[in-house]
Each structure stands twice: as structure tokens, then as C-alpha cells.
């Protein structure tokens, strides 16, 4: 359906623009990570990885959840309700956005560690999985199935291989801890999405005012949710200590 593809392009324009901003910010990390790799021990490097991965999860899950609940209200204000996509398509688009970005830190570490040969075959594997799943899922879910296929193929290849070799060859550690953490983060993001969905049921304001109110309410609610989940954890305290130390050094 040509009109459906046209409607989808409005969403991908917004998502790709946000992705470009976030990717540009993250690209600056690669040189920093590379220099840090050379100046510290594997254990210190591993600790820094965990801090950066935690921070990236907070930023990317926040952006993804906000995108999920605000992109339709934004499109409605911008182009009108006639240009809105099925919620399942929106979910599939945002999931593809999230699975791409959540691998930023493992991918950056793999690059700076020079682990290229180990993952050279995975793009081909990912392409075959993507094609197969796209055919199957498109028949079941339509357009959203294609985006779900992209997310699944990416998770089964790039997201697995990058972290596996970074942990196995870069840190000399078992990668199972990373995958456990990734699963926990996914569940936290999922329940955060459910939490914001429940809140969204009580906000009936439409238009530009509604968009602004939703942005404020959802943002405060989601950041409060993350704080409640993480504030007693080791990774939160360690990250807070690191940021506080960096700010103190600047002063």
C-alpha cells in the first residue's frame, strides 16, 4: 500500500532524526573509550563499560518510551489524525530504534578493541535471518512484521556477537553477566512502558497543549520510575560517584 508507506515515512523521518542526534553524541565516545582502553587495567575498563552501558540504557529507554507515547500525538498535531499509523506499527518502529541504540556501547568497545575479524560474518547471517523473518512475519503482522524482523535479526546477531567478543576477548570475562543485565534492562524498559501506558489513560488533553502536558508528565513519571528501580543498586551508586568525581575535578 503506497499510502501506508508514505505514512510510515513520516514516522521514520522523526525516528531517524532522533537517532542521528543520539548517534552523533555517542560517536564522540569512541575516541574517549579507545584512549581509556590503553590507559587502565581490564578491570577498570570493565567497570567503565558497565557505567556507560547503564547510562546508555537510561537515555535510550527514556527516548524510546517517550517516542512510543508521543509520536502519534505529534503526528496528529503536525499532519492530522488521518496520518496516524496502527499502534502495532509504531511499537515495531520504536523497538527497532531501541535495539539499534542499546548496542551502541558494546559496538563502540568492539571497534576500539580492534575486534573486527571475529564478527566479519555476522552481517551476512543477519541479512539471511532478516529476509527469512521478514517474509514470515510480514504475512502474520503486515508492515510491523518487517520491523519486528529487523529487531529480532539484529538482537540475534550484532547485539549478541559484539558483547560476546568484548567480554570474552576484551575483558577476559564470561559474557553471561552482560546478557543477564541486558535481559533485566529489557524487562525494566517493558514495565516502564506499561507504567507510562497506564498514566496515559488518564490524560485526555489533545492538541499542542496536550502534547506538552504529556511530555512533562511522562518524563517526570518515567525518571521517577527509573530512580525507584535503581537508586539502591550498586551500578547507580557507582555511576553517581563517578559523575560526582568528574564534576569535582572540573571545579
Regions found by a protein language model. Give the residues of each.
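Interfacial/gating helices of multi-pass transporter permease domains
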Residues: 1-16, 84-88
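Transmembrane helix-bundle signature of multi-pass secondary active exporters and lipid flippases
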Residues: 8-27, 59-63, 93-103, 157-160
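Helix-loop junctions and terminal segments of transmembrane helices
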Residues: 11, 15-53, 107-112
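Short alpha-helical transmembrane segments in multi-pass integral membrane proteins
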Residues: 12, 48, 53-68, 144-169, ...
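Alpha-helical transmembrane segments of multi-pass membrane transport and lipid-handling proteins
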Residues: 22, 46-100, 131-135, 139, ...
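Membrane-interface junctions at transmembrane-helix termini in multi-pass inner-membrane proteins
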Residues: 94-126
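Membrane-interface helix-loop junctions in multi-pass transport and translocation proteins
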Residues: 117, 124-159, 173-176, 194-216
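Membrane-proximal transmembrane or re-entrant/amphipathic helices at the cytosolic face
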Residues: 196-251
